C-alpha cells in the first residue's frame, strides 16, 4: 500500500550555509563598518546581534535573503523579543521550528478526511503518515495540502510503494 509522510523540517545544512553567507556579506557591507553585527547559530537557534534596532532589521533582511536564495522557507523561523545587551547593543533569538505540531497534524488529518479521497491519514509523532491504495490518490492529497496549508511549510518524504 503506497504511503508518504507529511513533515515540517528545515534543511539545517542550507541554514548553516545561509548563516555563513550572511556573516560574510555583513562583514563586507559599508553600512556595517565598525559595528558588531553578526549572526550566530547554535543547533536549532539563530542569534542576531547588532548595534541598534535599525541595524538588527538590516541583519534580519540579509539573513532572510540568504535563506531564500538557498531554498529554505523563512516561515521556519520563530523570532523572539529584541533584547538590549551591554553597550547599547541589541540581540534577537530566532528558533528554527521542527516537526508538525499537534494542532497542525490534526488540521492535516481533518483536511485529508474531508476531501473524500480514498486515503487514510494518521499522526505518528511529529509527522503525519498518509496511505492509500493508489499513487494517484496520494498525489492529489499532496496537491490538496499544498493548496490548503499555507501558514506552515510542509515537506513530503518517505514515499513507499
From Swiss-Prot:
GO annotations of cellular component type: cytosol
One Pfam family cited in the UniProt record for this chain: DUF520
UniProt keyword Nucleotide-binding, yes or no: yes
Gene3D superfamilies: 3.30.70.860, YajQ-like, domain 2
Example GO molecular function: nucleotide binding
Superkingdom field: Bacteria
InterPro entries per record: DUF520, UPF0234-like_C, UPF0234_N, YajQ-like_sf
Keywords attached to this entry: Nucleotide-binding
NCBIfam families the UniProt entry points to: PRK05412.1 (NF003819)
Family recorded in the similarity comment: Belongs to the YajQ family.
Function recorded in the entry: Nucleotide-binding protein.
Protein name according to UniProt: Nucleotide-binding protein BTH_I0730
Origin species: Burkholderia thailandensis (strain ATCC 700388 / DSM 13276 / CCUG 48851 / CIP 106301 / E264)
